[in-house]
Amino acid sequence: MKVCLDEDISPDVAAILRSMGVNATSVHEAGRQGFSDREQLELASAEGRVLVTRNRNDFILLTQEFFAKGLPHAGVLILPWTIPPDNFRLVARRIAQYVKRAGDSPSEYLFDFV
């Protein structure tokens, strides 16, 4: 499973994930700060990446819309706010554990919590 971290997750987490063997990038690294949630999801899906975000409410609606319209959707993982955003190692560890359990091919329209 390849992941892309949304704007609300530090790009430092992507670097830690890569050091753990996870294929990870971030919106920050790609220079896509300020893009709409829809654009972030479209771009991540075009790259075959599951988008990891803390923005649950907006991405629930977008996932429903993408499914209803049959638009490409590689998946969304929600990182809960109970995990401190400045604890980069803990954030990375939780994402890496999920990726390891999920394997290489997430299901289309995946929507889950890390």
Task: Show where each model-derived region lies.
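Short helix-loop-beta junction
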Residues: 16-24
